[in-house]
Amino acid sequence: MPINVPSGLPAVKVLAKEGIFVMTEKRAIHQDIRPLEILILNLMPDKIKTEIQLLRLLGNTPLQVNVTLLYTETHKPKHTPIEHILKFYTTFSAVKDRKFDGFIITGAPVELLPFEEVDYWEELTEIMEWSRHNVYSTMFICWAAQAGLYYFYGIPKYELPQKLSGVYKHRVAKDSVLFRGHDDFFWAPHSRYTEVKKEDIDKVPELEILAESDEAGVYVVANKSERQIFVTGHPEYDRYTLRDEYYRDIGRNLKVPIPANYFPNDDPTKTPILTWWSHAHLFFSNWLNYCIYQKTPYRLEDIH
């Protein structure tokens, strides 16, 4: 089934070439079934690339999805043309009276700052608080996962000795519909300077660790109802994202490691090995199907 996005969004052409069925708003209104309403707060610098990555995963399911793109009013994007933002994005002020089946909050390159020093932190906390009763299931990715765990449960983040970058082997730690169809072990990308610790999460009765890695630590945490899902890695990343970040970092003279388990023979001149794609697609499909579609009320106004 298709994903419904605003007409003219650049991601449409890219995804159409990949065989992902993207439906325009005009065509979608003639469908009789109720689509899932998904909100995406895009905090990543390259918003267009992140749109493509997330829509690719949301569009590869049997469910029709309407996507609303959100940006922060208290932080003006510097790496995405303002024309793109004004055309395709909306603000929290414009959607706070609506309800959504699902919500994705992306990562952001601010993890070395204390949460309260992030310039849009106050706005983000307002949005996260709103999500409690106006969204059926919210997925927090990378820095957003750390921010959500801190805001809702008081779990701190800790700075790592060096950047964690690469693709790491994970194991399913607890049965969950999110990992239905997964093997016991799977691979997933990480790209971060900070972490949350297992022992802090274990102290919170409402939370469960669903997947983890010996090298990368905690990967997926959820509350008991799976209406809050915290993903510390980047399953949405495409083949070249870690490579592009690595070249960006060394171009800034940063001392970062070569992404682990990524380049053949750890040679950055070679094409990266894609080992997490099946996990990413299945994980997002399970979220849409089991955590949202099969549980969300038919009437959006009944979400609370």
UniProtKB/Swiss-Prot annotation:
**Record's catalysed reaction(s):** L-homoserine + acetyl-CoA = O-acetyl-L-homoserine + CoA
Q: Which GO BP terms apply?
A: L-methionine biosynthetic process from homoserine via O-succinyl-L-homoserine and cystathionine
Site annotation (Important for acyl-CoA specificity): which residues? 111
Identify which top EC class this enzyme belongs to.
transferase
Q: Where's it found, cell-wise?
A: Cytoplasm
Q: Which UniProt keywords apply?
A: Acyltransferase, Amino-acid biosynthesis, Cytoplasm, Methionine biosynthesis, Transferase
**Metabolic or biological pathway:** Amino-acid biosynthesis; L-methionine biosynthesis via de novo pathway; O-acetyl-L-homoserine from L-homoserine: step 1/1
Q: What is its main location?
A: cytoplasm
Q: State the Gene Ontology terms under molecular function.
A: homoserine O-acetyltransferase activity; homoserine O-succinyltransferase activity
Give GO cellular component annotations, separated by semicolons.
Answer: cytoplasm
Q: Name one Pfam family in it.
A: HTS
UniProt cross-references to SUPFAM superfamilies, sorted A to Z: Class I glutamine amidotransferase-like (SSF52317)
Q: Where is the active site?
A: 142, 234, 236
Record EC number: 2.3.1.31
Which residues does the annotation say bind substrate? 163, 191, 248
Domain of life of the organism in this record?
Answer: Bacteria
Q: Name the residues annotated as site: Important for substrate specificity.
A: 191
Q: How is its activity regulated?
A: Inhibited by iodoacetamide in a pH-dependent manner.
Question: What does this protein do, in the record's words?
Answer: Transfers an acetyl group from acetyl-CoA to L-homoserine, forming acetyl-L-homoserine. Utilizes a ping-pong kinetic mechanism in which the acetyl group of acetyl-CoA is initially transferred to the enzyme to form an acetyl-enzyme intermediate before subsequent transfer to homoserine to form the final product, O-acetylhomoserine. Has weak activity with succinyl-CoA as the acyl donor.
What family, per the record? Belongs to the MetA family.
What this protein is called in its record is Homoserine O-acetyltransferase
Q: Which classification does the entry list for the species?
A: Bacteria, Thermotogati, Thermotogota, Thermotogae, Thermotogales
> Which gene underlies this protein?
metAA
